[in-house]
Amino acid sequence: MSRSEKLTGEHLAPEPAEMARLVAGTHHNPHGILGAHEYGDHTVIRAFRPHAVEVVALVGKDRFSLQHLDSGLFAVALPFVDLIDYRLQVTYEGCEPHTVADAYRFLPTLGEVDLHLFAEGRHERLWEVLGAHPRSFTTADGVVSGVSFAVWAPNAKGVSLIGEFNGWNGHEAPMRVLGPSGVWELFWPDFPCDGLYKFRVHGADGVVTDRADPFAFGTEVPPQTASRVTSSDYTWGDDDWMAGRALRNPVNEAMSTYEVHLGSWRPGLSYRQLARELTDYIVDQGFTHVELLPVAEHPFAGSWGYQVTSYYAPTSRFGTPDDFRALVDALHQAGIGVIVDWVPAHFPKDAWALGRFDGTPLYEHSDPKRGEQLDWGTYVFDFGRPEVRNFLVANALYWLQEFHIDGLRVDAVASMLYLDYSRPEGGWTPNVHGGRENLEAVQFLQEMNATAHKVAPGIVTIAEESTSWPGVTRPTNIGGLGFSMKWNMGWMHDTLDYVSRDPVYRSYHHHEMTFSMLYAFSENYVLPLSHDEVVHGKGTLWGRMPGNNHVKAAGLRSLLAYQWAHPGKQLLFMGQEFGQRAEWSEQRGLDWFQLDENGFSNGIQRLVRDINDIYRCHPALWSLDTTPEGYSWIDANDSANNVLSFMRYGSDGSVLACVFNFAGAEHRDYRLGLPRAGRWREVLNTDATIYHGSGIGNLGGVDATDDPWHGRPASAVLVLPPTSALWLTPA
């Protein structure tokens, strides 16, 4: 039987104050008004559809027309209770009627345990409860599918869901706040599986803003700023890699890392295309790892990506999150580890992102002397707030678990550790002890590192920390920050200063090449020749080398060999492996044409390929990287000849002698102390003709005799080519 007559009751309309808040978008519990509610022997159904011309409740085979009361509120009183299920048939002007389950009849999708853990900052899978999640519920009338939305905005006056589904209308989908948690929630039936959405937030400051979801898994392609509902059906093929990762300790393994900015490596490639081309290239060049500059969504394509606006979404510029998974999967199946740059130090002030999210300082510290980073014009996270700390720790775990990422390189750690970092006198506030240390940031970093290594054994966390803060790579249980490694910024600055000088003057700066060994084992180091050295007028590694092209090429080859031989892991920014001559620019990709035009670039690229092969095969270059037992000087003091020489030792008993001639002239009859007599094979000569060098060398090896030298029982006489490196191993 069809019924369309209107039924009335005394509770048809809500209280005027309730109605006013609903219309204004500031009602904290719209579910208490909308949906089905029993009053005596009646059930009242209310629906808030401001632009509808007709709303009908479908109860089984019966139809009940809702009366339009005011301002888009429709209601009907049904003459019975114990309503099990119903649908709404909504008609808009000029449109066909459409039938949908009522969003305001569903229970919250977050439980008390989830909210409690979040409030304490201890929810290790927070991304599974906040954000947007496709869900299905079985009802009396069948399965209802849709998307649940949840967002933290504790000081907001009201929050509504807006998107393509409702014409970006801020009235039709008001959300409810779940008690004192500050989490606003709504399940919306039939929401498109890849639909765009935002949250309309009525801020505590009276300003209404449309915000991207802080936990969005997907986004519109910038410069558009909406979030996109995203789910994954990706099937991984890297089981062997992941099983092996859990058993490894990266500190004691080979790690030579190729640093990549995806947008400018070869412009125009998608994640899926990069899965083929980038993977093949890295395998060919012999790197063990790739480090991706920030892949989390950021507004400006021409940037490195360090001002993140969607921490849980891989940038949509190159494809979907599953496409990014395919890139990681391909690298893993090729034996390449994947590190991503992660930016928990600060975030941009874009009005649609995290800043002043609910009209108050929420993710950022409320004190401007702590909550703003003056150098970058960004906000600083409030590391002491449990919910903010949980947002960041869970984000680290999200990348490690959901995308199988093998490591996080944490950007700008020094700016987190010091309250007075880059601040003028009087522009910062001390900690509770009167010091400059940011104690909350220290606790956050310790928690992040400890949790990440617990949840994902075998991963690596790397700090970009430019000061002498003690214990960066010391375990947290003995007071350290808990990082696996840190960038050795001192080594980078000293080395580049030295090799940039004309060889005539290098002898006066010999200490710049020896100083790093005074502290080489105080932390677990990565030696970075990174993106920071090819931008802002710094030129390139090639451009730093003095002399003509022949001398520049020799200088760059010897620098790279020195980097790979020095204790610590290696990192090299893209393009430097073939001696790119032009500074990086967001306007173009790498200058691959150099490989077609001159032998110097081909020679440098061949050298990097060979030193990576030698490096992986010789544990002396990596297995004792972090202990003094892995290194000893042969001669640190030959400044007159601009020569450095040292031994590297492996945990398997292997040895490697390394000698570097940074003079512009060759040295003949150069006696080098060695640990044993016999034949020593020249496994690397950076001046070899295959690298477009001059071909000066030792015919593949030398014979060491029992003539003590440099405090060692044996020695050999060598020819040292100009601006070169030689690596020798016992034959």
Curated annotation (Swiss-Prot):
Top-level division of the source organism's lineage: Bacteria
Q: Which pathway does it serve?
A: Glycan biosynthesis; glycogen biosynthesis
Locate the active site. D411, E464
Enzyme Commission number(s): 2.4.1.18
SUPFAM superfamilies annotated for this entry? (Trans)glycosidases, E set domains, Glycosyl hydrolase domain
Which enzyme type, at the first EC level?
transferase
Q: Which GO terms of the molecular function aspect are on file? A: 1,4-alpha-glucan branching enzyme activity; cation binding; hydrolase activity, hydrolyzing O-glycosyl compounds
Which reactions appear under catalytic activity for this entry?
Answer: Transfers a segment of a (1->4)-alpha-D-glucan chain to a primary hydroxy group in a similar glucan chain
Q: Which Gene3D superfamilies match?
A: Glycosidases, Golgi alpha-mannosidase II, Immunoglobulins
State the InterPro entries in the record.
Answer: A-amylase/branching_C (IPR006048), Branching_enzy (IPR037439), GlgB (IPR006407), GlgB_N (IPR054169), GlgB_N_E_set_prok (IPR044143), Glyco_hydro_13_cat_dom (IPR006047), Glyco_hydro_13_N (IPR004193), Glyco_hydro_b (IPR013780)
Q: Which UniProt keywords apply?
A: Carbohydrate metabolism, Glycogen biosynthesis, Glycogen metabolism, Glycosyltransferase, Transferase
Q: Which NCBIfam families match?
A: branching_enzym, PRK05402.1, PRK12313.1
Q: What is this protein called?
A: 1,4-alpha-glucan branching enzyme GlgB
Q: Which organism is it from?
A: Mycobacterium bovis (strain BCG / Pasteur 1173P2)
Q: Provide the organism lineage as a comma list.
A: Bacteria, Bacillati, Actinomycetota, Actinomycetes, Mycobacteriales
